[in-house]
Amino acid sequence: DEAAVEKVAHLRFPDPAPCGKTPLRAAGLSKAYGSLEVFAGVDLAIDRGSRVVVLGLNGAGKTTLLRLLGGVEEPDSGEVIPGHGLKIGYYAQEHETIDTDLTVVENLRRAAPGMDDTQVRSVLGSFLFSGSDADKPARVLSGGEKTRLALAMLVVSSANVLLLDEPTNNLDPASREEILGALGTFTGAVVLVTHDEGAVEALNPDRGLLLP
């Protein structure tokens, strides 16, 4: 895999789609699973271009918060309020944004319907899916390959708010550096959940949200 690692292209996220001053807000979010209350009364405003890192112990509900913000789950109370022009890019730690019934290239086409085949394959090449790799069914991908595909889908989405749940897990060192470099130059808003101190450094957050 050494040769493959050498080929990681210099990634950059495209310019985010235009949006209002506060593309995403949450008010009074609460969530419980059965009798287990995950969190209650969470308020959050994500301004255009802001960088927020979500902190908290394991089980504090960091992943759950991103799922609520991304519309994957509904809160028990409170609301998520989309602002003008909101376009979310959600990176799920469990890769559930990937459709395992589709091939790698079909997943990327779905994420960027406006791109032609040459552009799609070029993006996949920069994420180390070249030639026949791009035509593999997503269900046979390794954890690291799924991470690379999910990140490729984010890159083409022109999202203006990225919700990232442990985006550097399963990545080889060279790919991790590229992703962190791309995040550092991204001009949209980012909400990051991570145990990777290097990722927090690269993001250079404006603030942290501490879940109890």
What are these regions (language model features)?
Residues D1-R25:
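ABC-family P-loop ATPase nucleotide-binding domain
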Residues P16-P212:
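ABC ATP-binding cassette signature C-motif
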